Each structure stands twice: as C-alpha cells, then as structure tokens.
Swiss-Prot record:
Record keyword RNA-binding present: yes
Top-rank taxon: Bacteria
Membership in a protein family: Belongs to the NusB family.
Protein name: Transcription antitermination protein NusB
Main function: Involved in transcription antitermination. Required for transcription of ribosomal RNA (rRNA) genes. Binds specifically to the boxA antiterminator sequence of the ribosomal RNA (rrn) operons.
GO molecular function, one term: RNA binding
GO CC terms in record: cytosol
Stored PANTHER family: ANTITERMINATION NUSB DOMAIN-CONTAINING PROTEIN, N UTILIZATION SUBSTANCE PROTEIN B-RELATED
A GO BP entry: DNA-templated transcription termination
Gene: nusB
Keywords: RNA-binding, Transcription, Transcription antitermination, Transcription regulation
InterPro entries found in the cross-reference section: NusB-like_sf, NusB_fam, NusB_RsmB_TIM44
Amino acid sequence: MKSARRRSRELATQGLYQWLLSGSPAGEIDAQLRGAQGYDKADHEHLDAILHGVIRDSEALSADLAPCLDRPIDQLSPVERAVLLVAAYELKNHIDIPYRVVINEAVELAKTFGGADGYKYVNGVLDKLSAKLRVDETQAAARKQ
C-alpha cells in the first residue's frame, strides 16, 4: 500500500509534467489534480507544498540542478525533469525528510513514470545534488560507512 506522501509525490510529478508541457497556471493544474485517481489518499498539504513550491521556485531549482546534469535541463525528458524538480524541492525545503528517502522516492517515481533507465540518471543527479544541498547529512552518512 502506498503512503499518503508517496501519492502526493506521484500527483505532484503528474501535475508538474503537465505544467512543463502546457504551461498551464498552477491553480488550473491543482484543480485537475483534485479530481485525479488517488487524490483522496494523498497528503494534500505536502502535494500543495510541492506543486506550488516547484512552480514558484522552478528557476532557482533548475539552477541548483544544472551543475549536476550532463546536458541543459530543458533537454531532459519532461518526466525526468518533473521528478528531479520534486526531489530538488524536497531536498532544499523539507529538511525533515532524510536525503536518502528523497532520492529513493524520486527513483521510484522515475521507475513508475519514466523510461527504462531514467531512474539511474535521476539517482546519479540526486546523489550529486544532495552532496551540495545537504552537506552535513551526506558527510555524516559517508563517515558511518
């Protein structure tokens, strides 16, 4: 059974995918997501934070991701881009969620919605990004190994 947080990440990824392709306003995407399958079992507060936060902060999040990518962000598939934006937002704004959980959730989203090996790319990018955004946490984890 999927957790409410996982459902919120799935819906946010779907909404951001739509936003990346259509450029629709956040309010319109939000309204459509409220009718989506699984919405009733999602963490609505987390979904709203991710969806609206990523759209609001997309330029800054893209700038954070850029040094970790092997190509310009606009050349990524919309699915990979949406997944990476969700994870970047969580790494930056939800310090209560361990970085390994953020990466694992993003990998699962990439497996669910992305291409065959997209999850490997997402994992590599987020390893680099977490080392930048969560320095103390990633260094402490490295010392434990």
